[in-house]
């Protein structure tokens, strides 16, 4: 997920000037929601990981050192791809040409690029509908080089199939993001649905039984007769896709579906925040950092990533404004003037500024509770180990970093790379505490990699099941 920088509307002569009370209210609301997400998500993360370990399940979706090294690069590619997607064609090509000039590409190649841009975007400034770029590109291919069958198929597709433009792609992307967010909210709501259906009277008996379901796509690793794959050994098959759910998941999702419909129709800030908070809590719970070293590397990499894309370019803010989906938290600054339903001038905080520090703080929560113990800790007498409070201290550090971010944002009235302030607070404070307590080695070497879902660990689990 590309993260959006925290921002407020720029100052301009025709822009409403908000009072200190209005700005403070919106900032405190975002401040409270972000901290709530981190605390709840971290608590749920410790429970989730401990449950998986107790049931001898390997943890999927872990971020190890390998993933941490690649994450800033892959995130940059996704972010830049979205940026190019939102840019008009002419601006997109001119931007590429400027990059070539910065990279000191020979002038003759730059001139060829410019001539190509002028040729292919010549009609994009007219008032009438512009001809699709791919059609203009295809028209430049000599017809004698294209087989007649391909020409006929292309002509039929162009005249009969609906045209998929940027707007349609944006609608699909928005729907997918909103659906996943509502699904996350349903997961948070499920315990309450379960308690209601199990304990309340007059509930039909078929609803009291929580039937589990498994939807999967399995591939064989060798040739088999039809029907043999179902009974094949585990090592002879692999899952291409697998999702397990139960009846209460479906009921919770149906109960949350009005939020999805409402947000798709109205894009209100309340439904946006319901989806965004759910995304953040479940993301912190399920995105698993495998070790403190991996978490440190991830934070340092995204520290420079955030600075570059916010301060160095307009990419981050352009993508944040271009995606009309709940990828950030919002709270209106004009809520006192226009009311809850009509307020429309928002302060914003990107979900990445919550989830990225949040998964690191969740790791510290698991370190405090010794979810994974060393050999010495496992042999120590009950109650002899001293308590840890890295989680609480780092939450306070995050609060301080976020406060600094918002203060700088309001002072300069411009978008700020929040991780510039959050990463030093969340990384150096627990390290300093570990030095003071003499636990630097234990913290730095804290590792949950043996519970990560990979080939080596799967073999160990399978051999353990055979021995039992």
From Swiss-Prot:
Disruption phenotype: RNAi-mediated knockdown results in late stage embryonic and larval lethality, slow growth and pharyngeal pumping, uncoordinated movement, reduced brood size, middle body constriction, and muscle detachment. RNAi-mediated knockdown in L1 larvae causes incomplete cuticle shedding during molting.
GO molecular function: aspartic endopeptidase activity, intramembrane cleaving
Catalytic site: 306, 353
Alphabetic keyword roster: Endoplasmic reticulum, Glycoprotein, Hydrolase, Membrane, Protease, Transmembrane, Transmembrane helix
Transmembrane segments: 23-43, 71-91, 169-189, 248-265, 268-284, 297-317, 344-364, 389-409, 416-436
Ranges spanned by the short sequence motif PAL, renumbered to the chain: 417-419
Cytoplasmic side: 44-70, 190-247, 285-296, 365-388, 437-468
InterPro entries registered for this protein in UniProt: Peptidase_A22B_SPP, Preselin/SPP
Top EC class for this record: hydrolase
Topology, Lumenal side: 1-22, 92-168, 266-267, 318-343, 410-415
Stated family: Belongs to the peptidase A22B family.
This protein's name: Intramembrane protease 2
UniProt source species: Caenorhabditis elegans
Gene for this chain: imp-2
